[in-house]
Design a protein with these regions (language model features):
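Glycine-rich phosphate/adenosyl-contacting loop at the front of the ribokinase-like
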Residues: 1-77, 85, 92
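Conserved phosphate-binding/catalytic region of the ribokinase-like
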Residues: 2-24, 213-322
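Conserved N-terminal subdomain of the carbohydrate kinase-like
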Residues: 16, 20, 45-50, 69-150, ...
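Structural motif
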Residues: 22-24, 150-151, 199
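Glycosyltransferases and closely related glycan-assembly transferases
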Residues: 147, 163-176
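Catalytic beta/alpha-barrel core
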Residues: 152-158, 179-181
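Conserved phosphate/ATP/ADP-binding segment of small-molecule kinases
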Residues: 170-247
């Protein structure tokens, strides 16, 4: 079993100092086994494993680690992990990588387990095991890092457990970035989270995605969200706010592992936003970085310089509206 191939403490963007304030990422800390294969086998079939890696999740944890690589100070507020083998494995993994997190161990819960199978098409097939008891440990997580925060990141799939952090951020006028994935038609989710959300990211590379990007962005803006980011995988992306729409064609890359690409998009957008970049520049950079991430296994992020270089080459169309 291999371990992730980068170290946050010696990242290539160490000289890129960020603005004052920490990006706080709030969510579940899970043990993830990353499996790279040439092709996902047919049902009741098999195939060769190219690489097997002890890794970590969920998206909030990944975004926090990627922000650190980009040179942006971050802090991950996690759920607890169990006093079990998987808990010890993921604790060792995030510690070795320098992920900015204080791991809590709770012997009454089982560590969240995930298996992500990634193939060169960019697709991921994943399995996970969560318990209500584990999720409930988010309700007692220490929110004091929000006192000096510049942004809050959350994942919709952590449910009502993220509301406490979102409400706290809103009271302190801290912008909130929510990963909504494919839940743009889920009225209950939007009604619950949209009032606290400033930036929302949606993924439309799932098989069930039948709506066009512009329709999705309209749904999100009409729900009260200020900025909608629609990530279309290897094809394109769309960013929309009250005054403009930015359509970006993604660069073509040789895909090794699509795991973490959405998180890289999120982290890169937040990185640019905190530096005062406009919507087009943030979206170009996020699209470039998410695509470039797919060239390597795991969560290695391309340097800011290289990401900006590729971002400047992307075909982009900007429309302004009232």
């Amino acid at each position: 079993m291999s371990t992730p191939m980068y170290n946050q403490t010696t990242n290539q963007n160490a000289g890129f100092t960020g603005p004052e304030g920490t990006v706080v990422c709030f969510g579940v800390l899970s043990y993830l086994q990353l499996m790279l294969v040439e092709q996902v086998p047919i049902h009741n079939g098999g195939n060769t494993i190219r690489q097997l890696t002890d890794s970590y999740g969920d998206d909030a944890a990944i975004v926090s680690g990627m922000l650190q690589q980009l040179g942006q100070k971050s802090k991950f507020i996690p759920s607890a992990v169990g006093d079990d083998d998987l808990g010890r494995k993921v604790t060792a993994t995030v510690s070795g990588l320098g992920i900015p997190v204080d791991v809590r161990i709770d012997s009454s819960v089982d560590t969240v387990a995930e298996l992500s199978i990634s193939d060169p098409s960019g697709a991921r097939t994943y399995f996970y095991q969560r318990t209500p008891e584990l999720m409930a440990t988010l309700d007692s997580a220490d929110l004091s890092p929000l006192d000096n925060a510049s942004f809050l990141y959350v994942d919709w799939y952590d449910g009502d457990h993220i509301l406490r952090a979102m409400e706290s951020a809103a009271q302190s006028k801290i912008p909130v970035f929510m990963n909504l994935e494919s839940q743009y038609l889920n009225k209950e989710v939007l009604a619950k989270f949209a009032p606290y959300t400033d930036v929302c990211q949606v993924s439309v590379d799932q098989p069930e995605s039948n709506y066009d990007m512009e329709s999705i962005s309209s749904i999100l803006l009409h729900s009260g969200i200020s900025t909608a980011l629609i990530a279309g995988g290897s094809d394109r992306s769309l960013a929309v706010n009250s005054s403009q729409k930015v359509r970006i064609t993604a660069p073509k890359v040789g895909v090794v592992d699509g795991n973490g690409a959405g998180s890289c998009f999120s982290a890169s957008y937040i990185y640019g936003s905190l530096r005062g970049w406009n919507l087009e520049r943030c979206s170009r950079f996020a699209t470039a970085q998410a695509s470039l991430k797919c060239r390597t296994p795991g969560y290695q992020v391309t340097s800011v310089v290289e990401g900006e270089r590729i971002a400047d080459t992307l075909q982009t169309k900007v429309d302004y509206h009232n």
